[in-house]
């Protein structure tokens, strides 16, 4: 874990070391609709999760830690224990940013977040832009559940959340903004759209004034104008540098066997991104580095980076340094 490259925001004034982890524990839930697969029994002990968090923080001198997609950890029976453990190991000035999905709210999750004494930021990722598309992707009736969960976050969280929506068409942008604006209005929050990523200081300033920031991003903005082209290109080279906050490692998933799976940043089957399906085929950290440092991958990154098609900083942080 200590060899993971620190991630940097592309703007120097916001630059800091941090890492992003998602824990892909196993359970016996029927997850076809949400995860695209049935996964088996729990097999990652809480102590192992603590060890990974602690090693990561110490190894990278992290000022900011992202246990990404934390509400997906409803599949882990001790999600709240993990959040509380962050309280034990946090250092002065460290911020914890929880990236959650509105499909799930684990028991006690909101209460646990409200009890934390250090600074945290809850970013709620919404997949699907209207009732029809949501139910088509997630299963009939799921949209109603999501709306109910969002209302709970808005009413019960001590600090206002940030909402993060991907969109591809202008119609989806319009539906997204109307959808979240109406929900926020119900509980007395104003909405302000932002185009910078969730690390930007302006997010905090907006929240401090009692306004909900809504980060609506065009999903293809860092890669190419035509998302279909990305998928076609991925078919050829077996990876796609796909991210939404100026770095290649949006999240890494670690299982109990020590396998590390790219999540969000790189997909073996990127069609899963649009369907909100994670393809966790066996894929170790060594595999990831081999792909990143291959001539084919670096050439692709170099060509697209210099053409301004996406803004990952691999060229500046990777040992290959072919752009410099």
What residues fall within each predicted segment?
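C-terminal end-of-chain micro-motif
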Residues: 1, 323-324
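N-terminal [4Fe-4S]-dependent radical SAM core
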Residues: 1-20, 235-239, 248, 297-308
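Conserved glycine-rich "GG(E/T)P / GGGxP" loop and the immediately following alpha-helix
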Residues: 13-206, 211-216
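The −1 position to Zn-ligating cysteines in a subset of zinc-ribbon hairpins
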Residues: 26, 30, 244, 311-314
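Solvent-exposed loop and edge beta-strand segments that line ligand/cofactor-binding
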Residues: 41, 241-244
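C-terminal accessory region of radical SAM enzymes
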Residues: 149, 157-158, 188, 198-240, ...
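Short, acidic, Ser/Thr-enriched surface-loop or helix-capping motifs
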Residues: 254-255
């Amino acid at each position: 874990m200590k060899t993971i490259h620190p991630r940097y925001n592309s703007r120097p004034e916001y630059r800091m070391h941090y890492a992003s982890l998602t824990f892909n524990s196993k359970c016996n839930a029927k997850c076809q609709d949400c995860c695209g697969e049935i996964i088996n029994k729990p097999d990652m002990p809480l102590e192992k999760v603590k060890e990974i968090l602690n090693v990561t923080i110490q190894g990278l001198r992290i000022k900011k830690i992202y246990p990404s997609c934390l509400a997906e950890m409803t599949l882990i029976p001790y999600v709240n224990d993990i959040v509380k453990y962050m309280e034990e190991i946090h250092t002065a000035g460290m911020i914890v940013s929880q990236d959650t999905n509105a499909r799930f709210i684990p028991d006690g999750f909101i209460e646990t977040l409200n009890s934390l004494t250090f600074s945290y930021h809850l970013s709620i990722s919404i997949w699907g832009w209207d009732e029809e598309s949501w139910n088509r992707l997630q299963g009939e009736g799921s949209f109603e559940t999501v709306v109910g969960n969002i209302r709970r976050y808005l009413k019960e969280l001590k600090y206002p959340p940030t909402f993060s929506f991907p969109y591809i068409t202008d119609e989806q942008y319009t539906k997204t903004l109307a959808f979240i604006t109406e929900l926020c209005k119900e509980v007395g929050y104003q909405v302000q759209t932002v185009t910078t990523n969730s690390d930007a200081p302006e997010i905090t300033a907006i929240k401090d004034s009692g306004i909900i920031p809504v980060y609506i991003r065009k999903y293809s903005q860092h890669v190419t104008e035509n998302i279909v082209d990305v998928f076609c290109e991925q078919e050829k080279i077996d990876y796609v540098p796909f991210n939404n906050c100026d770095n290649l490692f949006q999240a890494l998933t670690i299982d109990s066997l020590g396998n590390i799976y790219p999540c969000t940043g790189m997909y073996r089957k990127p069609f899963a991104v649009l369907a909100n399906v994670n393809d966790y085929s066996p894929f170790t950290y060594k595999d990831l580095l081999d792909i990143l440092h291959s001539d084919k991958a670096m050439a692709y990154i170099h060509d697209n980076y210099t053409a301004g098609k996406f803004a990952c900083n691999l060229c500046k942080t990777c040992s290959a340094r072919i752009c410099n």
